[in-house]
């Protein structure tokens, strides 16, 4: 038997343990449902439940955590898994593949080590980072953390809900950012036409982002691309304008 991660896995673990020991696990399971697991239903019924089916996550951790968290979040909770990398004893991890996955898939939540946190910072990602492996600046003294058992399952869902709230916060414009907007031109700009390949590049850039933040992201990128086109005297928005706008936005987030 291995220490379980997730609700169904924990229940199956306890029943298997009961068969091996000759003890009845059902009273304990029922008691846990009324106590330890009870907050989970409140978390599930919160406003963030609407985002579970469209929210994505990635994980890079040891094999037990990667397999367990992926099964729990993807199979039991309905989140979308963008990538999952397992670290095994005696096998050197492919950090390059992890970095590339983070840069290309751009999940909303990333479970991992300090390495993954650095990879997110490199591309200015707004993904929410949740520590799930070493090395990392991480303190785990409470019994519900790490993520094993019923207490761990409740803890993980709580962290995911908080991450979704943080993602919503990142969408909101800050007052200091609103103060930095360009002055209104004396002559109003007419709507700028887009080349088909430029619009396709815009769609591809937004498609790679989590559903929750696409609405705000597409507006920022579209406005930035049109500003780039006007700045260089283009009459239409080109692929190059979209690429420069995306690079500028990523660079600004990273700063």
UniProtKB/Swiss-Prot annotation:
The UniProt transmembrane annotation reads none
Query: Which PANTHER family does UniProt cross-reference here?
Result: LIGHT-INDEPENDENT PROTOCHLOROPHYLLIDE REDUCTASE SUBUNIT B (PTHR33712:SF7)
Q: Which SUPFAM superfamilies match?
A: Helical backbone' metal receptor (SSF53807)
UniProt superkingdom: Bacteria
Any idea what this protein is called?
Answer: Uncharacterized protein in pufB 5'region
Any GO molecular function: oxidoreductase activity
Example of a GO biological process term: chlorophyll biosynthetic process
Do you know which Pfam families this protein is assigned to? Oxidored_nitro, PCP_red
Species source reads Blastochloris viridis
């Amino acid at each position: 038997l291995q220490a379980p991660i997730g609700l169904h896995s924990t229940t199956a673990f306890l029943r298997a343990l009961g068969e091996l020991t000759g003890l009845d696990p059902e009273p304990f399971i029922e008691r846990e449902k009324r106590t330890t697991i009870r907050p989970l239903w409140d978390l599930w019924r919160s406003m963030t439940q609407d985002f579970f089916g469209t929210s994505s996550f990635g994980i890079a951790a040891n094999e037990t955590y990667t397999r367990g968290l992926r099964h729990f979040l993807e199979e039991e909770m309905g989140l979308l898994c963008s990538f999952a990398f397992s670290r095994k004893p005696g096998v050197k991890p492919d950090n390059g593949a992890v970095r590339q996955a983070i840069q290309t898939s751009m999940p909303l939540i990333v479970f991992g080590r300090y390495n993954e946190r650095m990879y997110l910072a490199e591309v200015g990602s707004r993904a929410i980072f949740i520590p799930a492996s070493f090395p990392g600046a991480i303190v785990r003294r409470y019994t519900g953390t790490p993520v094993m058992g019923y207490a761990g399952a409740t803890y993980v869902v709580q962290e995911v809900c908080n991450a979704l709230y943080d993602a919503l916060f990142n969408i909101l414009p800050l007052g200091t950012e609103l103060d930095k907007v360009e002055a209104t031109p004396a002559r109003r700009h007419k709507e700028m036409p887009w080349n088909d390949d430029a619009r396709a590049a815009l769609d591809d850039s937004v498609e790679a982002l989590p559903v929750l933040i696409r609405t705000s992201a597409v507006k920022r990128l579209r406005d930035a691309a049109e500003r780039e086109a006007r700045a260089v005297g283009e009459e239409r928005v080109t692929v190059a304008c979209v690429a420069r706008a995306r690079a500028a936005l990523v660079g600004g987030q990273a700063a």
